[in-house]
């Protein structure tokens, strides 16, 4: 409400009326906040984090609350708050652009995936694109190979897109203990950028050797 009824939204609305921008969207990790936006009649698109692991998390005002303190051993399937959000967006013609579709690449490895089984880029993309209301997925690439792996979705067979087998084995608390780089733990009393440190760590452990670009952050 502070955003929608404050100076920031008023400024964005003014820019739209002047023709400087054509649409107004917003970004959030929280399904409750996203739902308020989708039902407000003032937001046209939402940038929202969607992947199989995140969809099993309960709603919270703080992404950090999704972890140890609140996970439920009996929790299973898609969190109802998120499923309802997707339906509301589709009903109200609010387009969802997906972020975190690959969970930072962690879903590609059995060692780092909360499911204990690796998913492919095609499976992750298919999962996101088959949610109600989803219009597109914003993926990140480091190499041409990453681009090729995503574009392969266009010609993939149905069996290559199938993610149901992996999801059927998902633990109840799918993303327990994992950092999502949301920044809600800030500020750190010691001045440490916790989200960035965890992001660099996750990128490093997914490579045979620490890339020079990552090392440069510590020079």
Predicted segments, located by residue:
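Structured C-terminal cap/extension of enzyme domains
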Residues: 39-42, 66-219
